[in-house]
Each structure stands twice: as structure tokens, then as C-alpha cells.
Amino acid sequence: MAVVKSSEIEKGSFLLIKGTPHIVLEREFSKTGRGGAIVRLKLKNLKNKFVIRETLKGADTAEAIEIYEVSAQYLYKDKDVLVFMDLETYDQVSLDLKESANFQDKVPFLQESETYALIMFDNVVIDIKLAPKIAFEVVEVEAAVKGDTVTNAMKNITLNTGLVVKAPLFINVGDKVLVNSETKEYAERIKS
């Protein structure tokens, strides 16, 4: 961990604020006549995803930290624990769902035997990185009838992980679809 001056902090930097890792989302530098330089930061807490704002004076410092990724295969979920295997060391990594809201949001997108990037800080997993769009198989569709509609008609579909999303009427059981992992919305059908 290194100490950096407030003027050296860039967008995308990782900082330790009050003992918790944050990423810099926005950085605004302003220099007033007599008051000196001010750096305004918009930061996202990497553990709970809350966004905060911090203002630093030109002479202030912050602690820069190193965040790294570990490639791991998702094995299974056992009650409130997600179990992964580190693909480099073959060690099992267990993540308690009660410890972090980050993990709870990712569960519907995790598929057994798939590879994910675990975001690490100080040898502790703080997040699971998902692809922007993830492929799923449709296992159940809600009955829907085509009719005269002004807008796009949508129906609920259940995916192989239990995730339920709205999709167009032409989606059927057995189809493969892409779902946006951030919005949890149907993106497109995968043509086979």
C-alpha cells in the first residue's frame, strides 16, 4: 500500500478510506485563488456498493491499495455458502452470503462449472466479477397470448439458475438467451 497525494489520484484508482476499499468513480480538481487546490472525489465502496463523496485539500494524502483478480470455477452453493475453486492453486474458496451484499446479488447469475473472476483485497474476496451479458437456458415460460398490443408484449421466463426475467413472446423452453448482469433484463436470444 502506498500513500498518494490528492492531486495524483485518478479516476479508476483504488483507495483505502476509513479501512474500507473504494474505487474512484469521478475526480474533479479545482484551484481557488487564495484557498488552494481542492480535489472532489466520488467513491464507490467495494464491499457494500455505497457511493460517497470526499473532498481533499491539495496537501492531503490517501492510501492507494492494490486490488487483484483470481480466476475461479464456481462449484456449488451449500446453504449460505458459495464454493469456488481457485484455478491456479486448486484450493477451495468459500464465500459466506451473510458477510456481503455483493455476493447475494450475484447468486442468480452463477452457474456450476463456469469460471468467474474473484476480486481480492488483502487476501479476502470482496466481489465476484460477472460478464456484462450471461447466457442461460430457458427452463420455464409463462403462458402468453399474442394479441393487439401497442407496445412490445413480454412474458416471464425462468432460467436454469432460477432467475426470472421478462422476455418477448417468441422465447420458448429450451431456448438460450443472454441476460444483462447489471440490469437483470433480457438482452437477446442466442441463435443455435
Curated annotation (Swiss-Prot):
It comes from the Bacteria. It holds the Pfam family EFP_N. Its main location: cytoplasm. GO terms for molecular function: translation elongation factor activity. GO terms for biological process: peptide biosynthetic process. Pathway: Protein biosynthesis; polypeptide chain elongation. It is found in: Cytoplasm. PANTHER family: ELONGATION FACTOR P (PTHR30053), TRANSLATION ELONGATION FACTOR KOW-LIKE DOMAIN-CONTAINING PROTEIN (PTHR30053:SF14). Involved in peptide bond synthesis. Stimulates efficient translation and peptide-bond synthesis on native or reconstituted 70S ribosomes in vitro. Probably functions indirectly by altering the affinity of the ribosome for aminoacyl-tRNA, thus increasing their reactivity as acceptors for peptidyl transferase. Belongs to the elongation factor P family. This is Elongation factor P. The lineage of its organism: Bacteria, Pseudomonadati, Spirochaetota, Spirochaetia, Spirochaetales.
